């Protein structure tokens, strides 16, 4: 697959790049994508949820009333799960949600995600550019020139660029990261994937 390289003004630069078929033209493995995305979202969970049982809740050492003669059901503690202020039966306890996915499955999922975007025509390549200072306005202008100002965009750079990353931090519709850091979820959670030209080589090195 070939794509025309765009300038920051949104025009064609006259240059053409060839996307590798094994990364951008592969058969989409929905199961690999499912496993990887499920793992990514599960691993984000902290698992710090906790409720107290009747043994942990404060108080309740005293018998609320005598055993016999009141007409009520017998009670041994004011912190019984049946009473207001009592402990919780089978409540949540802290535990991890981590799910392991093999490296080959992760790589297959990322290739599937890129291939899906390529099939839908949602991959753009822009010439390598740099910003002189951290400012949102010039970066927003570039997105507008490319027709991405109102679309959820994942922008991939060849390496971490603090100026570009921080310039786009205030723009809610754009997510900027170095190419090798992009996960399957990041790719699928965007409308368009915008590559800086040099970032394509990084992807080929990572997934090739």
UniProtKB/Swiss-Prot annotation:
UniProt entry tagged with the keyword Chloroplast: no
Compositionally biased region (Polar residues): 69-80
GO molecular function: rRNA binding; structural constituent of ribosome
InterPro entries: Ribosomal_uL4, Ribosomal_uL4-like, Ribosomal_uL4_dom_sf
One cellular-component annotation, GO: ribosome
Stretches for region Disordered: 45-96
The family this protein is said to belong to: Belongs to the universal ribosomal protein uL4 family.
Subunit structure: Part of the 50S ribosomal subunit.
Listed HAMAP family: Ribosomal_uL4_B
Biological role: One of the primary rRNA binding proteins, this protein initially binds near the 5'-end of the 23S rRNA. It is important during the early stages of 50S assembly. It makes multiple contacts with different domains of the 23S rRNA in the assembled 50S subunit and ribosome.
Protein name in UniProt: Large ribosomal subunit protein uL4
Gene for this chain: rplD
């Amino acid at each position: 697959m070939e794509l025309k390289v765009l300038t920051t003004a949104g025009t064609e630069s006259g240059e053409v790049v060839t996307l590798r078929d094994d990364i951008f033209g592969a058969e989409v493995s929905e199961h690999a994508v499912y496993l990887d995305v499920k793992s990514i979202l599960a691993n984000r969970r902290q698992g710090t949820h906790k409720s107290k049982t009747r043994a942990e809740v404060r108080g309740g050492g005293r018998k609320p009333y005598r055993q016999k003669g009141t007409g009520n059901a017998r009670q041994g503690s004011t912190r019984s799960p049946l009473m207001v202020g009592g402990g919780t039966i089978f409540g949540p306890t802290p535990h991890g949600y981590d799910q392991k996915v093999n490296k080959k499955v992760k790589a297959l999922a990322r290739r599937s995600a890129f291939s899906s975007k390529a099939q839908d025509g949602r991959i753009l390549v822009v010439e390598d550019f740099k910003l002189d200072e951290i400012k949102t306005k010039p970066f927003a202008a570039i997105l507008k020139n490319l027709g991405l100002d109102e679309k959820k965009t994942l922008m991939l750079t060849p390496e971490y660029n603090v100026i570009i990353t921080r310039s786009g931090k205030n723009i809610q519709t754009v997510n900027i990261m170095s190419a090798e850091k992009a996960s399957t979820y990041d790719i699928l959670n965007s409308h368009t994937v915008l590559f800086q030209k040099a970032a394509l080589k990084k992807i080929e090195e990572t997934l090739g």
